[in-house]
């Protein structure tokens, strides 16, 4: 639903001041636009340069003036130009027509694929769902990825922080999650690129096309909509593009009643843009120079990401930690909203263990017996204890060798190595690179497999049989094949 226009819609004001991306606009007495209304400035400036800018009202200054933040470059704006009050908030297209397309903060397509064929639009500002509309029973969101489902399960309608440096497999993990939710849950995904590199957005788009997540021949069969506000754009666009992506996701949840994945890369840039806008508006900075409204800004976005009785939005958010300081107000405020953290480790990627999810550093509030059940909880904790013991023994092994360990410790090391290998699995979206067919592993199969390793049932199988397979039956089949090849 498009936002209802207010009584001031169509009122024209005059630009009185331009400071970077911030404009002061004077309106007739009694005709001031509401805060968060979109202003539209179109036409030619005195030099004959075409100007088409949308700005969002942020402050009412007095003397019939408002202060607005532009969503694009203010090059060419001059004092005296007219600004039209649209009478409503910025609205973006929603629904199936957005799938396979790339949008900017204003919902305009930027992929050179022509206009979007839909009349359905929705305002980017709306209240979070009422308490009575929320699904309060915690439900595990099965991803089909063993290491996540067992050790750091995602909550349906929850928020997950994704931590990882360059080249450890963040994008591939994101693609696999998009693929799995489409195939197994019949859901769709929305990707919000907030203040990251344009090159990365382009690479992601090309990789989505290559892996089939975006179907170039028939866009309606695509599984993802993309919304970008990149590093080179003004802070207004970077501050609002996360809300544009979220609005598209909310439509799939509330109207189509689907389970939706919302990716935000990077949530820190959203806070950073808010800080820039806050300074431009003349607000007194808070701790470490952040905006005084930091908690409110983050909360307004995060509280809309939730499970309702109709459907769910599960959010995966890449979190940049400035100077690796977890006490910095930006990541610290974000952490308060997260249900799970998935940490990607370079050391695992170097060993060829993909996905390179760190089984000891990744956490989830869902991993408790009352939510996942006793068997899942016991298996997960037992696996983590074995891996932790292996980590402690590595120094001894490096200095003295395996032979100096006790019988029990040798058994622990053997099982830990099998667990480490079994936590890897081939991905559907990586088939073209690995030549191996992707695997979706049900949670029950994952738990059963790790229980068999921990019980010692599979102690006789070679370590390599556990590498890049799906469930435990594939391990046994691979071990038999290896044995027959060794004989032959």
Curated annotation (Swiss-Prot):
Taxonomic classification: Bacteria, Bacillati, Cyanobacteriota, Cyanophyceae, Synechococcales
Gene: atpD
Function in brief: Produces ATP from ADP in the presence of a proton gradient across the membrane. The catalytic sites are hosted primarily by the beta subunits.
Keywords: ATP synthesis, ATP-binding, CF(1), Hydrogen ion transport, Ion transport, Membrane, Nucleotide-binding, Thylakoid, Translocase, Transport
Transmembrane annotation, as ranges: none
Membrane-related topology note: Peripheral membrane protein
Annotated family: Belongs to the ATPase alpha/beta chains family.
One GO CC term on file: proton-transporting ATP synthase complex
SUPFAM superfamilies, per the entry: C-terminal domain of alpha and beta subunits of F1 ATP synthase, N-terminal domain of alpha and beta subunits of F1 ATP synthase, P-loop containing nucleoside triphosphate hydrolases
Name under which the protein is recorded: ATP synthase subunit beta
Binding site for ATP: 164-171
């Amino acid at each position: 639903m498009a936002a209802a226009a207010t009584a001031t819609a169509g009122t024209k004001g005059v630009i009185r001041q331009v400071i970077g991306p911030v404009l002061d606009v004077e309106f007739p007495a009694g005709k001031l636009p509401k805060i968060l209304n979109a202003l539209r400035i179109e036409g030619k400036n005195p030099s004959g340069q075409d100007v088409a800018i949308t700005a969002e009202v942020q402050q009412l200054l007095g003397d019939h003036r408002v202060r607005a933040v532009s969503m694009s470059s203010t090059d060419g704006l001059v004092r005296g130009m007219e600004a039209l009050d649209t009478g409503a908030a910025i609205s973006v297209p929603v629904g199936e027509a957005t799938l396979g397309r790339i949008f900017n903060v204003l919902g305009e397509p930027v992929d050179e694929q022509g206009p979007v064929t839909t009349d359905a639009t929705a305002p980017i500002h709306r209240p979070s769902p009422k308490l009575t509309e929320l699904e309060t029973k915690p439900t595990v969101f099965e991803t089909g990825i063993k290491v996540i489902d067992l050790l750091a399960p995602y909550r349906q309608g929850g928020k997950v922080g994704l931590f990882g440096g360059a080249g450890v497999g963040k994008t591939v993990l994101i693609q696999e999650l998009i693929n799995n939710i489409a195939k197994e849950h019949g859901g769709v995904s929305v990707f919000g690129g907030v203040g990251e590199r344009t090159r990365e957005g382009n690479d992601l788009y090309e990789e989505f096309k290559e892996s089939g997540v975006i179907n170039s021949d028939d866009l309606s069969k695509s599984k993802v909509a993309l919304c970008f506000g990149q590093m080179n754009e003004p802070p207004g666009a970077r501050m609002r593009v996360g809300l544009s992506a979220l609005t598209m996701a909310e439509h799939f949840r509330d109207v189509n009643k689907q389970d939706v994945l919302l990716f935000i890369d990077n949530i820190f840039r959203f806070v950073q843009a808010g800080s820039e806008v806050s300074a431009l508006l003349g607000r007194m900075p808070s701790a470490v120079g952040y905006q005084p409204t930091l908690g409110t800004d983050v909360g307004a976005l995060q509280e809309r990401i939730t499970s309702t009785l109709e459907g769910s939005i599960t959010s995966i958010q890449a979190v940049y930690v400035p100077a690796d300081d977890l006490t910095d107000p930006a990541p610290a405020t974000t952490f308060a909203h997260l249900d799970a953290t998935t940490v990607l480790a370079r050391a695992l990627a170097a060993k060829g263990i993909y996905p390179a999810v760190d089984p000891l550093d990744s956490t989830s509030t869902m991993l408790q017996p009352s939510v996942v059940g006793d068997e899942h909880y016991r298996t997960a904790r037992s696996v983590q204890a074995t891996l932790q013991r292996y980590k402690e023994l590595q120094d001894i092994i490096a200095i003295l060798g395996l032979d100096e360990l006790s019988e029990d410790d040798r058994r622990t090391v053997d099982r830990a190595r099998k667990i480490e290998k079994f936590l890897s699995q081939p991905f559907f979206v990586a088939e073209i690179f690995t030549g191996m067919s992707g695997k979706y592993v049900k949670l029950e199969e994952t738990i059963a497999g790790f229980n068999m390793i921990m019980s010692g049932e599979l102690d006789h199988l070679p370590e390599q049989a556990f590498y890049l397979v799906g469930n435990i039956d594939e391990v046994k089949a691979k071990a038999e094949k290896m044995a027959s090849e060794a004989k032959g």
